[in-house]
Amino acid sequence: MGPDLRCFPLLLLLLGLWWSVRPLCAIPKNLTRAQWFTIQHIQPSPLQCNKAMNSVNNYTWHCKPQNTFLHDSFQDVATACNLPNITCKNGQNNCHQSAKPVSLTQCSFTGGNYPNCRYKDAAQYKFFIVACDPPQKGDPPYPFVPVHLDKII
């Protein structure tokens, strides 16, 4: 006799439901919010998006639809946290606009399946807005650290 496959569709449904409620923006285990911000958004030397996005997608096991890399150091981006607070897109008041524009690359997903994700690159020179929070254990010892890239302007 072969295996009873009557429960197989139910198993697939449950797996699909679990995957759909798993947040795509969840911070990977063992990383602080600032460390995850660094992986997703700090890239001092520009790389082509297909290569650069590997480091992001390897944590999430999916092709992230869009991502922006700031071509600056974490330290320089963190200095924005010392500038006046502005309201974030989510209504919180812990966002800060950079003092000057920076070089950045916006990566837009064009096709493929993880791990073979393909992206289009768009080099730009713009201001950024970051959300900042007090550092967690393991973060650099700044009063506030960037934890979310809120907007590019």
Curated annotation (Swiss-Prot):
Q: Which PROSITE patterns match?
A: RNASE_PANCREATIC (PS00127)
Identify the InterPro entries for this entry.
Answer: RNaseA, RNaseA-like_dom_sf, RNaseA_AS, RNaseA_domain
Q: Where in the cell is it found?
A: Secreted; Lysosome; Cytoplasmic granule
An example Gene Ontology molecular-function term: RNA nuclease activity
**One Pfam family from the record:** RnaseA
User: Where is the secretion signal located?
Assistant: 1-26
One GO cellular component term of this record is: lysosome
The kind of enzyme this is, by top-level EC class, is hydrolase
Name the residues annotated as catalytic in the UniProt entry.
H41, H148
Name recorded for this polypeptide:
Ribonuclease K3
